[in-house]
Amino acid sequence: MSKDIATPGRTTEILKKYGFLFKKSLGQNFLIDSNILTRITDTAEITKETNVIEIGPGIGALTEQLAKTANEVVAFEIDQRLLPILDDTLSAYNNVKVVHGDVLKADVEEVIAEQFAKPELPLKIVANLPYYVTTPIILKLLHDNIPADSMTFMLQKEVADRISAVPSTKSYGSLTIAIQFYMEAELAFIVPKTVFMPQPNVDSAVIHLKRRKEPLAEVNDEEFFFEVTRASFAQRRKTLWNNLASKFPALKPRKDELVEGLNAIGIDLIRRGETLDIPEFAKLSNFLGDFLKEK
């Protein structure tokens, strides 16, 4: 079998062979350290009884490692120029299918049903996500309720910090809540910028998201819950009252009544959003939802 793709020499050889030029608009940075790939598949707990969806295979470095350890791999690639390269670099593996398309526009459940020979096997999602589209992809996968046991992503370290953050830290925010509401989040390890070609400006990190059996808190209306959390972080230095009154002007004439009701459930409107944990945000949104419906 040919030398691993994830080395500086082999990557350069492949790119030269096909005259491939990186597209900055697609955030293309290819891994050139096979040790990192092994750590990613170990973190994702890939086995021969696992199906994997990969997003953004590039020239196939991570795909190759996944193919060695998984039952089947289906990879979404948006850049048509990479399709013939992937045909070449992954030709030794009969358990890989590459789907040309944008995962943000795809019906992922349909792809699972059509592309995997055994769609009933446990599914995991693994990706080296382009920085510019990280958040939209993760939120789409969550909101579409894709039946994945876990998701393991390599992404910009700053975003990984935000996803895995805890309350009362500068990284904690609406993105933290949007993901941790459904998933347990663990920052697995840091990936230095030096192991990519071309080298990005910042370090990356691998984050492992494991689906909770039930959402972290009980809410009456999930859409409204996320609306409240986003509003609470609209201006981080402002209090809950300032942010919520700006988002929901109907609260202003009833401030005293609102303060009294929220104090009764242990939430003080002079706090900042970053100090509330997810169960507290659930209590806040449930109360607000009922409060705003009252005449």
Swiss-Prot record:
Highest taxon above the source species: Bacteria
Location in or out of the cell: Cytoplasm
Keyword S-adenosyl-L-methionine: yes
Keywords of this entry: Cytoplasm, Methyltransferase, RNA-binding, rRNA processing, S-adenosyl-L-methionine, Transferase
Listed GO MF terms: 16S rRNA (adenine(1518)-N(6)/adenine(1519)-N(6))-dimethyltransferase activity; RNA binding; rRNA (adenine-N6,N6-)-dimethyltransferase activity
GO cellular component: cytosol
Top-tier EC class: transferase
InterPro entries per UniProt: KsgA/Erm (IPR001737), rRNA_Ade_diMease-like_C (IPR023165), rRNA_Ade_Mease_Trfase_CS (IPR020596), rRNA_Ade_methylase_Trfase_N (IPR020598), rRNA_adenine_dimethylase (IPR011530), SAM-dependent_MTases_sf (IPR029063)
Pfam families found in the cross-reference section: RrnaAD
EC number: 2.1.1.182
GO terms of biological process kind: rRNA methylation
Binding, S-adenosyl-L-methionine: 29, 31, 56, 77, 102, 128
SUPFAM superfamilies noted in UniProt: S-adenosyl-L-methionine-dependent methyltransferases
Catalytic reactions of this protein: adenosine(1518)/adenosine(1519) in 16S rRNA + 4 S-adenosyl-L-methionine = N(6)-dimethyladenosine(1518)/N(6)-dimethyladenosine(1519) in 16S rRNA + 4 S-adenosyl-L-homocysteine + 4 H(+)
CDD domains per UniProt: AdoMet_MTases (cd02440)
Family: Belongs to the class I-like SAM-binding methyltransferase superfamily. rRNA adenine N(6)-methyltransferase family. RsmA subfamily.
Function: Specifically dimethylates two adjacent adenosines (A1518 and A1519) in the loop of a conserved hairpin near the 3'-end of 16S rRNA in the 30S particle. May play a critical role in biogenesis of 30S subunits.
Protein name: Ribosomal RNA small subunit methyltransferase A
Protein species of origin: Listeria monocytogenes serovar 1/2a (strain ATCC BAA-679 / EGD-e)
Gene expressing this chain: rsmA
